[in-house]
């Protein structure tokens, strides 16, 4: 049987994700962000609820991306996720994209020219953000064009780069329905942005989200729940440069900006520059929130849930792979577990996120 990997956030899970799972082949293993997202935001609903939604709609196994993989720039996010999926025996990687191009060809380009491409990045002016530099790199070396509204396509290029030398097949699937950032409700396949924007419209949610009750009946989290914690961390931290990726310039800008900022958007807008994108600033603020220092990655793979079919695959891997099914006396990743504790502080109804939790098991693989 073909084993297909999918890298996801499911923030939240919606009909577009269900379409991706239905279109992908074989046994589907999801490497999913935990309780903090790649662009530096707390998850709308917790990782266990999102895992359950995925398993009820086509996923066979859901594993958790460690904090220092989840909350990273696209290249590191892709590299960390693909490394984990390869340990789980995937043969191909499926992903949604605005532009279906020959990503396999791009893998070959990077395998042949990685040194030249990396060297080229270092020649570009520092006024450009890293995403702008990588876009120029792909344009020069592979002739890839960018429309400016293709976040999944850009992530697909990071998947191509991370897949070099891995012997896996990239399987792009054309994104259906609303655009990534669209807030339009008039789509059967509405975007995650639209769903987050219209959470109080239950009729819209029930049509846009499979198993909508899991979304409707659980706490909805945002930066608003954590801004006071962040403000405390910034104002009381003696040396922000000890936090991952915070340099002297950013430390100064953040310390000044927090004194006049009433919410996360104001703070991000004040700190961000051409060089420091809003996404990067949000990630750095997340690092400050959870007091993240130099990154270390766990050796084990944390299993959030599986179906009967997924369980059979995991049994084959158990003796040769460090699979973690319960965090207790046996710890998994200190940084992720600390981030989970802070996430839980945001709402009294969020249950324990790490210790003692066991994988979600769906006996019938296609419960809709």
UniProtKB/Swiss-Prot annotation:
Keyword tRNA processing (UniProt): yes
Family: Belongs to the TmcAL family.
Disulfide bridge map: none
Top-level EC class: ligase
PANTHER family in the record: TRNA(MET) CYTIDINE ACETATE LIGASE (PTHR37825:SF1)
Documented EC number(s): 6.3.4.-
GO terms under biological process: tRNA modification
InterPro entries assigned: Rossmann-like_a/b/a_fold, tRNA(Met)_cyd_acetate_ligase
Subcellular location: Cytoplasm
Pfam families: HIGH_NTase1 (PF05636)
Gene Ontology CC terms, in alphabetical order: cytoplasm
Biological function: Catalyzes the formation of N(4)-acetylcytidine (ac(4)C) at the wobble position of elongator tRNA(Met), using acetate and ATP as substrates. First activates an acetate ion to form acetyladenylate (Ac-AMP) and then transfers the acetyl group to tRNA to form ac(4)C34.
Protein name: tRNA(Met) cytidine acetate ligase
Entry GO MF terms: ATP binding; ligase activity, forming carbon-nitrogen bonds; tRNA binding
Species annotation: Streptococcus pyogenes serotype M2 (strain MGAS10270)
